[in-house]
Amino acid sequence: MKFYTLRLLGFLLMVAGLAACDMEQEIEVKLPVLPTQLVVECYLEEGKPIRLALSESAGYFEGAQPVIIHNATVTITKNGSQVIPLRFSVDVDNENEKITNYSSRHVIQSQPGDVYTLTITDPTGRRVTGSTTVLPPAPLDSVGYKFNDKPKESQEAYLYIRWQDDPSRENFYRLLTHKNDSTGGVDSEMDAEINDRLRNGQKIIYTTTYRFDRGDTLNIKLFHLDRPYYEFISSVEDARRSNGNPFAQPVTIKSTVAGGYGVFTHLNYNTRELIIK
């Protein structure tokens, strides 16, 4: 009996060894070589000059250093008549941690319904176009907070924001909240994309978890977005969450421009400052 047991054990060890040989296998995936595309990022804001970042795309495993495009012809046209040329100029925005390389001193002054059109042509003939319509600002009604029932020294508050949705149109929103830190910097506390698909024409109330302390200073911005920009930022967030996850589906960034990648939009928002006391 002992003899058969030893033979069986030896057989099982041999099978395990053979199976282990097949568990590791190098697979070489040949990625397609895609042509580079122009990449643009431009946000128009009321009362501010125009700044635009123009670079080109790169492969996933290539260096992250962007290729800055020189000598491109960049124009923004307002309502089909007023042409605003942008010139090459590298500017560093330390507050928002952005670098732009085309700009104009023209200050954005617009009304809801105004249309801005972007046209870019680089020296090799690549062309990018985009268009954005100015929306009315989101009517931010009220912001407030409420503490939990813990002892005062350990209490935390949740934040609530209220606004009225316009029933006459499809609406998309982005809600940002930043907190001033002790070093004079700013920490992001909330970034939410919201639509009115289930709340058309209703009072929208958005709340956070209990996360804020007494003495916190919060800066709240409610953006009114068009559908292309809403889909752009939603796809960017989906791509960020799936990056590095072997079980996640690949995500395609939904650009707001044609002929390349990126975003061109007008930002219209209301802002409030709230101190937790």
PLM regions: where:
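Bacterial N-terminal signal peptides that target proteins for export
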Residues: M1-L9
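Hydrophobic alpha-helical context, especially transmembrane and signal-peptide helices
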Residues: L8-F11, P32-V33
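C-terminal motif of bacterial Sec signal peptides marking the signal peptidase cleavage site
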Residues: G17-A20
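A sequence/structural signal for flexible, mid-protein segments enriched
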Residues: D22-K277
